[in-house]
Amino acid sequence: MNQSELIRALPKAELHVHIEGTFEPELMFEIAQRNHIDIPYKSVEEIKKAYNFHNLQSFLDIYYAGANVLINEQDFYDLAWAYFKKCAEDRVVHTEMFFDPQTHTERGVSFEIVLNGLKRACKDAKEHLGISSHLIMCFLRHLSEEDAFKTLEQALPYKADIIAVGLDSSEVGHPPSKFARVFEKAREEGFLVVAHAGEEGPPEYVWEALDLLKVNRIDHGVRSEEDPALMQRLIQEKMPLTVCPLSNLKLCVVNDMKEHNIRRLLNQGVHVTVNSDDPSYFGGYMNDNFVAIQAALDLSNEELKKLAINSFEASFIDEEEKQNWIEEINQI
């Protein structure tokens, strides 16, 4: 079996994907028309042209503009269902999706509308596509601690539907320490915790996520390599890094995929996984990310399998289910 066949055959878990970042131009245009919302683009082609950006902030500007068309429960359902269909094509059998309630509640869309649409899509994905899923609620780090506390309060009645809380949006200037008290409260309430750190931000942010937020996983974390002591800790603690190669390329975290450090991290014993982040904006879903790193870094079949195994080991599914998928990978 060659590498491209193996990539298609491997079952995978996706642990770092923003549901708002799966918004394809065609669906954005369709929902904007359905909801009679003016967007600054007259066609799908114009939206596609706008998906041309060079850093995290210019991407976020477009990302939030797109999210403005999401108003009704059906909109959130359609968004998630379109992503699940992509998962089915890529043999992503389990996904843990981020959603950003503050992006919607500050526009007057209720927390309940967002969650109900996503929940319904999750249920249908399990029933019709055999894909399991968890929801992870993210706090926007460019907003205040007070705003994050309010969002956490809104989530408390839905603890059964939200497995973890996370931290995303503009990283630089918004260290994890800003939200230490919010994350302490979230942990007390029984949520697992993850956080974006070490993408554009320095290794110090990864230390803070570990020590102050007490995370179960680090999202991105590729800049950890700059700090040997941090690397040692990540390896010792088997701390997962949910790495997003095409995202790193598109946002100029790396200038060339051949420079990406995912293979080095993997071979040094860091628990790295492959993910798509915001696939509609970054030009690729799960398998596209695997294909890109395989082509650039010449990954072996064993390395590809290890990345797939890592995705299940780092997931929040139960141990028996993890072992079943890992066994299947080992038999391929």
From Swiss-Prot:
One of its GO terms (molecular function) is zinc ion binding. Its cofactor is Zn(2+). Binds 1 zinc ion per subunit. Gene3D superfamilies: Metal-dependent hydrolases (3.20.20.140). SUPFAM superfamilies: Metallo-dependent hydrolases (SSF51556). Disulfide bonds: none annotated. The record marks 220 as: Important for catalytic activity. Keywords: Hydrolase, Metal-binding, Nucleotide metabolism, Zinc. Zn(2+) binds at residues 16, 18, 196, 277. GO terms for biological process: adenine catabolic process; hypoxanthine salvage; nucleotide metabolic process. It comes from the Bacteria. CDD domains: ADA (cd01320). The keyword Zinc-finger does not apply. One of its GO terms (cellular component) is cytosol. Pfam families: A_deaminase. Substrate binds at residue 278. It catalyses: adenine + H2O + H(+) = hypoxanthine + NH4(+). The keyword Electron transport does not apply. The active site is at 199 (proton donor). Its EC number is 3.5.4.2. PANTHER family: ADENINE DEAMINASE. Belongs to the metallo-dependent hydrolases superfamily. Adenosine and AMP deaminases family. Adenine deaminase type 2 subfamily. Catalyzes the hydrolytic deamination of adenine to hypoxanthine. Plays an important role in the purine salvage pathway and in nitrogen catabolism. This is Adenine deaminase.
